[in-house]
Amino acid sequence: MIVVFRHESTIGHVFLTGGDYHSGAGGFSRAPSTAVTYVAPWLRTSQFPGGDRGLSGGGQRGRLWAYGPGYVEGIYVPPYQQAYTTELRTTCTCTPSRSRPGQVFTTCRSAIHPCAGPRVDSCVQHAGCVRQTTRGDKRKLNMSDSPKNAQKVTDEADVVLVGAGIMSATLGAMLRQLEPSWSQVIFERLDGAAQESSSPWNNAGTGHSALCELNYTPEKNGKIDISKAVNINEKFQVSRQFWAHQVEEGILPDPKEFINAVPHVSFGHGADQVAYIKNRYNALKDHPLFPGMQYADDEETFTEKLPLMAQGRDFSDPVAISWIQEGTDINYGSQSKQFLKAAEAGGTEIRYGHEVKDITKDGAKWKVTVKNVHTGDTQTIRANFVFVGAGGMALPLLQKSGIAEIRGFGGFPVSGQWLRCTNEELIEQHAAKVYGKASVGAPPMSVPHLDTRVIDGEKGLLFGPYAGWTPKFLKEGSNLDLFSSLRPTNLASLLGVGVQEMGLTKYLITEVVKDMEARMESLREYMPNAKKSDWELITAGQRVQVIKPVGAPRFGSLEFGTTLISNSEGTIAGLLGASPGASIAPAAMIELLERCFGKRMIEWGDKIQEMVPSYGKKLADEPEMFAELWEYTQKTLKLEKA
């Protein structure tokens, strides 16, 4: 069956078949007198199989989107490619709206030309057209003539980014400013940006800078080790500077949509925890990266700072808190979307609903095989550089690439759940991110905290996370993910960790069997008067903890941080692990640039320093610079005191 659409402002026709289509918004008038099937605006053509796809006029003269696959005058159109109608003419020429290397244009000698239009980014090849490309071709969008050979279609790009989350968004933003002529393509298996780990409901939204997170300051032999806390804080200062620069450049136009001031508080109860909180405070209070840290262990101050946590509390059990007012709550989903909106405006192509299935070496380049999750069609794209920012799926994709650097690495998935407050009165009584001590054997992502969140301008309150276990590597993943990642080269690492981490195993079993009442008991350590009727259980994101190969007798080490993997040539890289994750994305991506593009760093140095003024320096050794940059980022990011 053939469906013919006729745009009211044109004389040309577009023929499409296959898939399941809607006509565009107000863009189609009655059918011509020839025998055709007419589809009214937004009317579904249910005769076509293949799910709910659409055609949208988009308000532009003669433009249609084929969410196919489909046919344009008998010529196969791959899904998500643009098709155009225009007026009848004997000859016509498609020319790009912006003349730049890599644009494709077609000279057409057809009476009815479905390609021409006011803007041509990828011209649909048409019977009678002569295919040409501009000189200095960097990116060719080749289209097949028939469904039979559609899978052989190969695009080319300078950079392919796997995953439309905060990591790919950050790296893409950096590379666009360092090398604006490089073409970038992003593939995302879901139908929108930042819907997995970067989604605000799938993470704590903490701007991790070790202001309150106790797992960054372990106590050894009665002494607090602050080295990890200082390192995390240094990296978060890089994030603040980079984000402030992006705000000034208009890339992140509204900082209040993604970052808000929320005090960070460390909390302990019982004699041992109180002693630890005090020792930690004494170790950090004079450090230049932790200015303004305060401490209290009296009932009056505790009640003033944390009224919700004071209600119903028996203060005969000692308590202590330390805090810094200038903590942050971050919506990484909103931030990712701002980055990616600017990316599309700058020429980056983002293909949602496309899952990367394989990455293979192709000479000095990489061949990336991608599947359209809606139609099942596959395509390949050849890239000079590939970044795998696919969350938990980074491990199996890097394994498929065959690089030596991933040998021996494994992944241990840990899921999470939150209690979300549904009582607006309670939400308004709490204004802090309060972190306590983790249970013995618990992974850092399971450190309990009572969190004020600001999501889409609305204040919320979460408690958790409660850890769980599933073999999935993504929240929207498969139960076969873990088993698919097993290799002869990483079995020793996995078994070694299994023997060593019995405490973690016991902890996860305990967490998995908890019912709602048991979860409420954990909450009541923070909020004694908590009632089950005021809270609901929601599922958080999935994290894959890194298992790193080490020598005998351990064979494997369970890592709770973020690990960057890259090959020796610097042509492919990926990010493994969990916390601190998104908080240090800019620092992680600068490390990637140094590893993979070392020869360009001298050329890029000035631009990187413009984006991150402290680049190459340790702010812990530069207190005056830290103070200056702190004030700059506070003002630019609109972080008034909480």
UniProtKB/Swiss-Prot annotation:
Q: In which pathway does it act?
A: Carbohydrate metabolism; tricarboxylic acid cycle; oxaloacetate from (S)-malate (quinone route): step 1/1
Entry keyword Flavoprotein: yes
Enzyme nomenclature, EC number: 1.1.5.4
Co-factor requirement: FAD
Q: What keywords appear on the UniProt entry?
A: FAD, Flavoprotein, Oxidoreductase, Tricarboxylic acid cycle
Q: Which GO terms describe its biological process?
A: tricarboxylic acid cycle
Region annotation (MQO domain) maps to 143-642
- Which molecular function GO terms apply here? 2-hydroxyglutarate dehydrogenase activity; L-malate dehydrogenase (quinone) activity
Q: From which domain of life does this come? A: Bacteria
Identify the Gene3D superfamilies for this entry.
Answer: D-Amino Acid Oxidase, subunit A, domain 2 (3.30.9.10), FAD/NAD(P)-binding domain (3.50.50.60)
**Region described as Unknown: spans on this chain:** 1-142
A Pfam match is Mqo
Q: Which reaction does it catalyse?
A: (S)-malate + a quinone = a quinol + oxaloacetate
For this chain, the family text in UniProt reads:
In the C-terminal section; belongs to the MQO family.
Q: Which HAMAP family match?
A: MQO
Name of the featured protein: Probable malate:quinone oxidoreductase
